[in-house]
Amino acid sequence: MTEINFQEIDKKQQKIWEDNNLFVTPRLPINPKFYCLDMFPYPSGQGLHVGHPEGYTASDILVRYKKMKGFDVIHPMGWDAFGLPAENYAIATGVHPAITTKNNIDNFRRQIKSLGMAYDWTREIDTTDPNYYRWTQWIFLQIFKKGLAYESTVPINWCPSCKTGLANEEVFNGNCERCGTKIESKNIRQWVLKITEYADRLLEDLEGLDWPESTLAMQRNWIGKSIGAEVDFEIDGHKENLKVFTTRPDTLFGATYMVVSPEHPILEQITMPEQKAAVKSYQEEAAAKTDFERGDVNKKTGVFTGAYAINPVNGKKIQIWTSDYVLMGYGTGAIMAVPAHDERDYEFAKKFGLEIIEVIKSDKGVEKEAFTGDGELVNSDFLNGMKVEQSKAAMIKFLEEKGVGGAKTTYRLRDWVFSRQRYWGEPIPIVHCPKCGVVPVPESELPVKLPEVTNYEPTGTGESPLANVPEWVNTVCPVCAGPAKRETNTMPQWAGSCWYYLRYLDPKNDKTFVNPEIERECDPVDCYIGGAEHAVLHLLYSRFWHKVLYDLGYVKYKEPYAKLRHQGMILAYSYRGEDGVYHGYDEVDLSDLQNPKLKTTGEKLNSMVEKMSKSKKNVINPDDILHKYGADAFRMYEMFMGPFEASKPWDMKGIEGVNRFLKRVYAWGESVETDEVFLSTKELDILRSKTIVKVSEDIEKFNFNTAVSALMIYFNDLSKIKGVPLKHFKTFLALLHPFAPHITEELWSRRKCGPFLVKTAWPEADIMLLRSEDMGLGIQVNGKVRGSITVNASASDDEIKAKAFEEPNVKKHMEGKALVKVIIVPKRMVNIVVK
């Protein structure tokens, strides 16, 4: 077989596409629009590794398919370029982050273009461009004017390495999400956004979104809506009441002590003199801990205040303790403890010898462990004999009638700590005037540009490095024209990504952030693709900003992203010696893949599948893959590795197989005889239509690996024919095009099949031909045959499910049960699992 220079073909076709503006879409669509968005990358100095393009390849397949289906496709790319890594690099090297960011963007753009992605580069944006962050600042001002941004000196998560505050969402297992350093608690003046005012809507509007259920669950859990009751406890000998929130008002008769947060404002007033020293010491210890450390259920600490509360349902005096597992920022900062029916309260009570009263009947009792299940109420006066839900309602009614409480809803979600004490971020457009107070910068003076400085070192005092630039800080108050100072904190890395999908629609507009008519026609994003790690960071923040803009009348739709899909992580093999040292691929003899050895010594190495990292020497650079195999093999292999959403290891044997397939396709495409006069067979025509249906459905469902399999089957049949009907030749190239655009476009052109393949209509299946093929399927419910159906061979999975659910006997055995899953075994069986 003649050696094929795929790299030459790649460059040729990419230039043709770019010269002819094939992926540029008018700002106002003419045909039905399809807005496909990738989560834009942070342009790091390391460039792309093979894991990054997985999502980009999926979106590109979808985009090319939609273009061929007649849509005006919006498919932009840009750069989320503010953030700590560029600033840290500037500190280490003395090179301004603006310079390194530009260089990194140039490299990322080159790498992405080399993959043949169908991006509309006329829409390119960069969050560090003043023409972009002018509008980020403008949106902040709208949030401020709406009363949703405020200053507060609060205990925050402080990273001593990054020397900046972090939002709760940026802390993972008590460590900084960015650098892994253990977080400290520190009181610092911050700008905070009232995301909590949107908690209900952020929760309710998840309904109807086509998002992965796991992501919806993460957002629901992060918002953490709790429905229960607020209860007022009198404090013995004091006028003040202690207010608590509980999701279990039915257990009030089992409340045997109370716990308040060490930060609770009432603590100092109620602590008895003999306990003041112990309480003060405990408060100091708690102040040094992070919220994560305080949540460690294995470390139960606390101090008795000497004070007592009165249980409002039975008049009993119960002790008031302080413990750091109660957080001031959640609920009321105080809890009623029911140790018989809460594991943490139980362990605390056991440690400190506090009373435990069973109020929900259990077979085992509560001598050895708390009972957290449902049951009948006992030892609870008027609630005795009731079930939990009934007793909750009865207790809330009692509290309301007595004037000591009532129904209440709370949220786990906290307001968003928005400011950062670093240089490389958007300046917050606020001025501090000794006379006028906090004053917004006039919109006509935006953008407030970052000053060029030579020292980016964070101060570590809670002040941004900008505080050390007096010529920038000192300004004039927009209201009174007196001396004033600029806000020196900067915005977090999430600010620019909160609204970038809107700017892509109208990136050059200098009058507004997006033309209203364009926004109405092009929003929302029809398909958003990116990592699941952003579920409670970017995705939550972006939805919040969008809802503010919706309330202000700037956007038409309530939600920004109609459909969301996550790619799985691409892992890689690492090779490690017995001494624990990792070795790079160039050091390893892989002639026997089952027994990797060190080239220099022959030492046997341990092979593991791990996340790519420089320290493990298993990062695979796409430039190397492209140089060896070309873009189409790279793209197609990433889609063929396994289910899109699953994690899977990069395997050089796999890409070799795809490369061989594409070489066969190209050689066949160059040499095979093809003409309209060549006759087809019914079997081949049926296979053609089946393949069209299969590939189309699989692209829509992100089942790219099975689409590739279907294409391989179709090709194997075509490659056995000496004279291929032109209809089949064109169909195969068109179906393969989204996966391998370069060689298909090249063959399309060389065989004079017509104008650009990417602008050719997507093939249509002969449905009448497929309808002649009916098949019978058995139906099982929980493993037992309950019926059968006859469907057409072209029926989609959804059509098969719908017909199976309507089969009378199947319907009978599903009645009153929850559907768990449906497994369709092609041409044989439908297995329905219910519970």
Swiss-Prot record:
A GO MF label: ATP binding
InterPro entries, per database record: aa-tRNA-synth_I_CS, aa-tRNA-synth_Ia, Leu-tRNA-ligase, Leu_tRNA-synth_edit, M/V/L/I-tRNA-synth_anticd-bd, Methionyl/Leucyl_tRNA_Synth, Rossmann-like_a/b/a_fold, tRNAsynth_Ia_anticodon-bd
Alphabetical GO biological process terms: leucyl-tRNA aminoacylation
Superkingdom of this protein's organism: Bacteria
Enzyme Commission designation: 6.1.1.4
Subcellular location: Cytoplasm
Primary localisation category: cytoplasm
Binding site for ATP: K614
Pfam families the UniProt entry points to: Anticodon_1, tRNA-synt_1, tRNA-synt_1_2, tRNA-synt_1g
Record's keyword terms, sorted: Aminoacyl-tRNA synthetase, ATP-binding, Cytoplasm, Ligase, Nucleotide-binding, Protein biosynthesis
SUPFAM superfamilies: Anticodon-binding domain of a subclass of class I aminoacyl-tRNA synthetases, Nucleotidylyl transferase, ValRS/IleRS/LeuRS editing domain
Reaction(s) catalysed by this chain's protein: tRNA(Leu) + L-leucine + ATP = L-leucyl-tRNA(Leu) + AMP + diphosphate
GO CC, alphabetical: cytosol
Motif ('HIGH' region): 41-52
HAMAP family: Leu_tRNA_synth_B
Family of this protein: Belongs to the class-I aminoacyl-tRNA synthetase family.
Name listed for the protein in its UniProt record: Leucine--tRNA ligase
Lineage summary: Bacteria, Pseudomonadati, Elusimicrobiota, Elusimicrobia, Elusimicrobiales
